[in-house]
UniProtKB/Swiss-Prot annotation:
Pfam families assigned to the protein according to its UniProt record, in alphabetical order: PRA-PH
Name under which the protein is recorded: Phosphoribosyl-ATP pyrophosphatase
GO molecular function: ATP binding; phosphoribosyl-ATP diphosphatase activity
Lineage: Bacteria, Bacillati, Bacillota, Bacilli, Bacillales
S-S bridge residues: none
Cited NCBIfam families: histidine_hisI, PRK00400.1-3
EC number assigned by the record: 3.6.1.31
Record organism: Bacillus cytotoxicus (strain DSM 22905 / CIP 110041 / 391-98 / NVH 391-98)
Amino acid sequence: MEKVLKSLFETIENRKQSPLQGSYTNYLLTKGADKILKKIGEECTEVVIAAKNDNKEEIVKEMVDVLYHCFVLLVAKNISLEEIEKEVRERTGKISKTEERKEIDTL
């Protein structure tokens, strides 16, 4: 899986460096953060709906869309996968106390 995600990220980076006519990725990068963020919000909402409907196939499809749009945002903001990996590694194994986290009470 790591190779597939890295390949997707590299493809998005390549589109930024060498735009391809008609590319959806280039469209998003050209429109900028507001458009990318709107798409992330839409796709996250679709994940929530799929999960509420207990539709595994749709959850998987919509999560792929979320990951793609998040990768586009990272590329747009010049954030590398290595930076994300470093942060994940730093958090791995740390104990997080639930009482220190803000309660989500809007559901």
